[in-house]
Amino acid sequence: MLKPHGLTPLALTGGILVSLLSVSLSAHAEIATDVATTGWATQNGGTKGGSRAAANNIYTVKNAAELKAALAASGGSNGRIIKERGVIDVSDGKPYTKTSDMKQRARLDIPGKTTIVGTSSSAEIREGFFYAKENDVIIRNLTIENPWDPEPVWDPEDGSAGNWNSEYDGLTVEGASNVWIDHVTFTDGRRTDDQNGTANGRPKQHHDGALDVKNGANYVTISYSVFRNHEKNNLIGSSDSKTPDDGKLKVTNHNSLFENISSRGPRVRVGQVHLYNNHHIGSTTHKVYPCVYAQGVGKGSKIFSERNVLDISGISGCSKVAADYGGSVYRDSGSLVNGSVISCSWSTSIGWTPPYSYTPLAADKVAADVKAKAGAGKI
């Protein structure tokens, strides 16, 4: 049964145990009530999620039924906090047989004014995918195993040889404003792409994206997060012809790890996107997730890349650092590629300046900082 802010009574003996419990609960409370302090999510009135939720709108969940009930419950004027414990299998152990079945059972819609926070390093969502389509959402300290579509579709027009494509991303931010994604780990997890076999002469791809921001989404910060073992990672802007995106898709990603990511780290259309102090690790010859490119510069994008570090074997120039997908505005400052300073700027001016305060680390400090602090369980 779902219980708002319910804690199981414990028979405590000894002042030390009581003290430790008090400290733990205090730290946990601070995590759940934090608001965004960096990047684009601080603008437009800020991102508060459910930080001011009333006690009866704070839920602790440990299975799919409780999670879905907490998301569906009335949040009140100050929203809700959902504290996620352990591994939640959204399928309840019943494998999805069709894409339509997955759409019905795996989708997790996040209401506005919601904070979702993992209570420990073991907090993880499997066999499900989040949709944030309402404003003011915070997700922190959580691992999301990227969803596995049981029915990939063959598209003979995708690329020179055709490709298999699938539905559903680990998290989709669609049309929502003010979203903060912090210390979240996205990974293919138990189902890496080398397990899928081939058909029509091409790898059969059961994954789509890890994190997509699209359809007029705005004021989004991704901080100290991890993207690991995935092909098409982070899309910002889903179409060259989406006019609702004009003037929107303002996104910051900082101090995050991209490890064995083939592409889209991120791939941007239209948006004013600030990428700083991120660490990319990989290889162009990786057997499962070879690096094709790091950042994709798409139509109308205005990317400011700053003091990022790319340790990707096989990269020697800018074509795989900032790949041309129809864009023309790209500025880089102080980034390192395999230990060397490299200037990959296409433009001296990008037409905008970050309106928020921030202090980027020197590039030679980035790898250690990201290793120590990024991802679920390091908050």
Curated annotation (Swiss-Prot):
Gene3D superfamilies: Single-stranded right-handed beta-helix, Pectin lyase-like. Transmembrane segments: none annotated. The gene is pelP. This is Pectate lyase. Keywords: Calcium, Lyase, Metal-binding, Secreted, Signal. It comes from Pseudomonas amygdali pv. lachrymans (Pseudomonas syringae pv. lachrymans). Its main location: secreted. Ca(2+) binds at D169, D208, D212. It is found in: Secreted. Binds 1 Ca(2+) ion per subunit. GO terms for biological process: pectin catabolic process. Its EC number is 4.2.2.2. Residues 190-209 are annotated as: Disordered. One of its GO terms (molecular function) is metal ion binding. It catalyses: Eliminative cleavage of (1->4)-alpha-D-galacturonan to give oligosaccharides with 4-deoxy-alpha-D-galact-4-enuronosyl groups at their non-reducing ends. Belongs to the polysaccharide lyase 1 family.
